[in-house]
Amino acid sequence: MTHAAHGYLLQVRLRTVSCQGPGWRRVRHGRGFRYLDADGEALAPEQVDRVKDLVIPPAWTDVWICPDERGHLQAVGTDAAGRRQYVYHPEWRRKRDEQKFDRAIELGRRLPHVRTALKRQLLGDPVERETVVAAAVRLVDLGCFRLGAETYAEENGSFGLTTLQVRHVQRDGDARIFRFVGKGGIDHEIVIVDRTLIGIIDALTEHRRADGRLLATREGRRWLSIDAAEVNERIRELLRLDVTAKDFRTWKATTTVAQHLANVERATSGSGRARQAREAIEQAAELLGNTPSVARSAYVDPRVIDLFEDGHTIGRVRSENGLDRAVVALLTK
């Protein structure tokens, strides 16, 4: 697809499509592939060119390709791990990214008030449900945890906040350290020094089996675990916003980059500023437990780096609430 044609397409309203509908197929042919329409006929050369522009990974199988270049979903396939993967129209991704970052800004705007509400909720009985779920939300805020999924814990041995076990927490003086293998086999080490949270964590680990679920509430002699849906529901209730723990990760990655760039002496050369931006992204990636490439493409609001390039940063801040307010102000000027 030519650049001009692509530019024209972005002005055309996208169509919502389903991979359950008629589509094109990719089939093995020697060392490459053949592309067939819904009737099994070979695609025209210009159609093949459009499919190749989608850069569908060669390892994908059972590939469905949208016949309409305006479809919001352009291709679907199954990767080597058996997971369904999706290729979306770039304009659809752009709009989704804008919505994601705008949603994160609104989260950041409301976070200071939410932390005040959480402080009250964290004063309850440390093994009662209200308190434990509040502790989970605060841990997401402080530690940038993924919530995790039962299937990943059982099948891959990878954990998130709601699937962590008692054995994943170690005491180190006045700190509690979470050490575990997360999504993608990445080793995580998250240090918590908040005194109120530590009191709750200690109550949840005391006299319990090492393989017991950390985030659980005591009902008589039984411990009942907290799941990701319950934590996300509390997040939405507190923020009065349709967000999840993942939006916290987007916001925390963005504020981490903004703070790093505010604390460096801005380089005078373009290459120097690019290096400083890379270093800020690396810091966010470490917090997230992702690669710098993923952190930059999926989590950090690009406007923070663009503003830094133009000479705008948040200045120095002294508190987490101050950081949130400063980044919101920077991004909404």
Regions found by a protein language model. Give the residues of each.
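A positively charged, amphipathic N-terminal helix/segment that binds anionic biomolecules
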Residues: 1-159, 165-277, 281-288, 293-297, ...
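DNA/chromatin major-groove-contacting recognition/catalytic segments
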Residues: 302-328
